[in-house]
């Protein structure tokens, strides 16, 4: 199925959205599991944070997979500014924003930013850094995953 060029700039087929959808669900659930392991969520808290984690992961991955396109349409690639004109510089900035967002959200689960047992959960920086690194490095490992994923998840069609 082909999308019109004006619907989502830079995306011409639904297959180009596969890495965002598949990795968004997997990494969003991974983020949720890390928090769920440390804190017993119930009912709407679990659903609310899960929905928030997955949606935010979709947004971050959309920007990560379309960084070159963004830099080209904004003209930032030609500016040659040290970090902002670099594809990896922008991806790392997105990863830092994602890392801080995850840590802040986990810190306020119980209503505090102190990061202690009484003030909030404050998910470990290690956990949030692992998730952020998986998001930032997604364009590198996605081609490896395509070979083992089913076709409906963006994998290579089976021959035969």
Per-range role (PLM):
Residues 1-14, 156-160:
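Short, strongly hydrophobic alpha-helical membrane anchors
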Residues 10-18, 41-55, 80-87:
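Transmembrane alpha-helix entry/boundary detector in multi-pass membrane proteins
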Residues 13-40:
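N-terminal signal-anchor/start-transfer transmembrane helix
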Residues 31-43, 100-111:
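C-terminal ends of transmembrane helices
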Residues 48-71:
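A generic, lipid-embedded transmembrane alpha helix
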Residues 101-126, 142-144:
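Membrane-helix boundary connector in multi-pass membrane proteins
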Residues 138-160:
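Juxtamembrane boundary at the C-terminal end of a transmembrane helix
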